[in-house]
């Protein structure tokens, strides 16, 4: 299994899936869903990205956990993507199904998962979502594997009533995350630099930027972040529902390589 190397500040590209069978907006052509995902994944690989994460972005309105009828399709697409690229692959099962995410990653040879609410409580458009750290560790013990858990702190599209510093510490010390993710308020929105700096100061594990990465802020974020999850700016014309733009993806790779001295 190929893993992420946080010493090299990995660029992780988001493969936003089209609506899956069983989701409200599924269009009826499953092969198109698979082909779209593979194309975006290959574009990230060609551009020089360090990893990809597959998420069921098209399945909104989301449920807190994945409906059973969606899970097989998600697994099939993830396996098809894994077969076509050699990059480390992650899974994010929206809105917060850490058990399914881990199970799919384990089944398809994934390297990591993203969990939106690992600890604490988030008030979201799906209602109140509670952390799932203990349930996740139970599954890890049952099926094994060395899949990393990257956990959001004060995840986007949600309201939080905890102190950010305490939330970081809880995610690291009590949730046992392998890395934490700092995001803006909504998909594609830039993060608070103050939050990133604070997270780096109090966290003993890698800190990733999870939204709003673009050429204008990349150099500044690079000073502090241990990795980047990118999904909006790299799309054609910066529109999230468009395919990944090879040229835009290459721009970030060139910037990263320059800053790394490669």
UniProtKB/Swiss-Prot annotation:
Q: Which InterPro entries is this protein grouped with?
A: Aldolase_TIM, BtpA, RibuloseP-bd_barrel
Q: Which domain of life is it from?
A: Archaea
Q: Which family does it belong to?
A: Belongs to the BtpA family.
Q: What is this protein's name?
A: Uncharacterized protein PF0860
What is the native source organism of this protein?
Answer: Pyrococcus furiosus (strain ATCC 43587 / DSM 3638 / JCM 8422 / Vc1)
């Amino acid at each position: 299994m190929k893993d992420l190397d946080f010493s090299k500040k990995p660029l992780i590209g988001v493969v936003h899936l089209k609506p899956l069978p069983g989701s409200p907006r599924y269009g009826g052509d499953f092969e198109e869903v698979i082909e779209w995902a593979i194309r975006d994944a290959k574009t990230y690989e060609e551009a020089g990205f360090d990893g990809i994460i597959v998420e069921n972005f098209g399945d909104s309105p989301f449920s807190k956990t994945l409906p059973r009828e969606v899970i097989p399709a998600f697994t099939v697409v993830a396996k098809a993507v894994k077969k076509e690229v050699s990059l480390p692959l992650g899974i994010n099962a929206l809105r917060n199904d850490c058990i399914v995410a881990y199970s799919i990653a384990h089944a398809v040879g994934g390297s990591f998962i993203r969990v939106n609410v690992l600890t604490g409580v988030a008030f979201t458009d799906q209602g109140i979502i509670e952390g799932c750290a203990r349930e996740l560790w139970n599954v890890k013990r049952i099926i094994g594997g060395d899949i990393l858990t990257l956990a959001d702190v004060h995840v986007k599209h949600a309201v939080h009533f905890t102190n950010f510093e305490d939330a970081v510490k809880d995610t690291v010390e009590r949730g046992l995350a392998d890395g934490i993710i700092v995001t803006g308020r909504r998909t594609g929105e830039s993060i608070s630099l103050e939050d990133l700096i604070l997270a780096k100061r109090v966290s003993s594990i890698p800190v990733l930027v999870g939204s709003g990465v673009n050429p204008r802020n990349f150099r500044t974020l690079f000073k502090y972040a241990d990795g980047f999850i990118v999904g909006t700016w790299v799309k054609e014309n910066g529109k999230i529902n468009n395919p990944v733009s090879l040229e835009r993806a290459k721009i970030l790779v060139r910037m990263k390589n320059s800053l790394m001295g490669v």
